[in-house]
């Protein structure tokens, strides 16, 4: 029973913080402070980190955290270098954008060098995977509707996107499952199909001859 309670508490913590970058930043603030102070190796030697249990283990597994400003200043629009070959949307993610925003930034630069305009609407949010995994499908669908609408609105204002790319493979798999979440809602099933059909892992998208040739030329 204690384990069930503990697991439920962990689920609620994940549900409350992980899908929301600002809350995640707040939760990670102590880690940033401790790492900047350089005191963590001493705390490990003294056994203090072991006293923190799972939290201490999690800190050891965390990658170097990029500056928060990188996420906050992530451009909404990136222009293709040279002739444009495609317009793509980018799902920046929640955990991905907090912990690895530099990877999203590098991806956007590669896409631009491959001849793509890149759109990263600010109104997008968590894909809903975390809520779906713990059984909160209503919240998962709410987040899905928000993402679908974010890219629909972008296309209405700026024109159609040829693809919607993502770095996080697990989240990408969930984005492709959206139509199955709305089988009892004709309108959103149609809208989610239109969205999901455009979703590709960034490596999948760039593995096309036209983009590979363009990228190779830009690196010479």
Predicted regions and their residues:
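Iron-sulfur cluster-binding electron-transfer modules in prokaryotic oxidoreductases
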Residues: 1-220
């Amino acid at each position: 029973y204690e384990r069930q309670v503990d697991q439920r508490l962990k689920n609620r913590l994940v549900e409350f913080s992980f899908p929301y970058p600002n809350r995640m930043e707040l939760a990670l603030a102590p880690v940033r402070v401790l790492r900047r102070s350089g005191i963590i190796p001493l705390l490990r030697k003294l056994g203090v980190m072991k006293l923190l249990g799972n939290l201490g283990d999690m800190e050891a597994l965390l990658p170097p955290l990029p500056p928060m400003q990188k996420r906050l200043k992530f451009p909404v629009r990136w222009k293709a270098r040279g002739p444009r070959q495609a317009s793509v949307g980018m799902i920046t993610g929640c955990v991905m954008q907090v912990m690895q925003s530099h990877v999203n930034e590098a991806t956007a630069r590669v896409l631009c060098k491959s001849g793509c305009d890149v759109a990263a609407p600010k109104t997008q949010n968590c894909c809903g995977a975390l809520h779906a995994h713990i059984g909160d499908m209503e919240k998962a669908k709410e987040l899905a509707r928000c993402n679908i609408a974010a890219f629909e609105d972008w296309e209405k204002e700026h024109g159609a996107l040829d693809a919607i790319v993502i770095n996080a493979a697990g989240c990408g798999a969930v984005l492709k499952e959206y139509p199955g979440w709305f089988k009892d809602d004709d309108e959103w099933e149609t809208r989610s199909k239109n969205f999901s059909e455009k979703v590709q892992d960034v490596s999948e998208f760039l593995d096309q001859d036209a983009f590979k040739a363009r990228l190779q030329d830009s690196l010479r």
